[in-house]
Amino acid sequence: MTEKKITVGIIQQQNTGDIADNKKRLKHHIEQCAAKGAQLVVLQELHNSLYFCQTESTDNFDLAESIPGESTEFYSRIAGELHIVLVTSLFERRAAGLYHNTAVVFDTDGSIAGKYRKMHIPDDPAYYEKFYFTPGDLGFTPIKTSIGTLGVLVCWDQWYPEAARLMALQGADMLIYPTAIGWESSDTPQEQKRQQDAWIISQRGHAVANGLPVVAAVSYTHLRAHETCADL
């Protein structure tokens, strides 16, 4: 993307248990980003619902859906109508007993440009993702779109420099991370700052080491919904 400027919209929305309302509000924020000139819009990790991995419950598998499916049709229409590239994050039901945390990228015509299945799966207090997700099998392959080649990864992948490096070596023009990350409610302000600083430093490290812009849409449950645009 030498000498090419792209305006990126990042949406970080506070969700509720009402998936239909969450998607309605996401659509509004996506439209607002497009109205501000965004050519690329990135949503947070697992943006259709609350971050359900804080507990281990078989009921949560009802949130999963096939790809393609209802959500891909919904976001495909939005991307096509607004002529934007849209990065989404879905709970994929691939087959009986096989589920993934999957990023799906839509091109400006609404077509699916590609997808990435999260490779690094955490298993920590309040992040019980191994209960739900099988590690991805698509490798670290950048996704080609009409605005550039996107190195799309998901959340916990951002703590591993190899993932970013492999994307860069294969021609990614930027690194993108739909993310859901925070801290324990019992953490002190000092511990919260330590974790936040470590996360920011890691993202800067990916940018510096690979010479690429890094885009992260972060879901914090205590944040108010907002969208922002920036030029890269």
Language-model regions: role of each:
Residues 2-8, 142-151:
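Beta-strand-turn-beta hairpins that frame and shape the catalytic cleft
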Residues 8, 22, 30-59, 79, ...:
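Active-site beta-strand/loop signature of hydrolases that rely on acidic residues for catalysis
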Residues 64-87, 158-230:
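CN hydrolase (nitrilase-like) catalytic-core segments centered on the catalytic cysteine
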Residues 91-92:
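Short beta-strand-to-loop element that shapes/binds the nucleotide-sugar donor at the catalytic cleft/hinge
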Residues 102-105, 141, 230:
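Short beta-strand scaffold segments in enzyme catalytic cores
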Residues 118-132:
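A short, polar/charged loop-to-alpha-helix boundary motif
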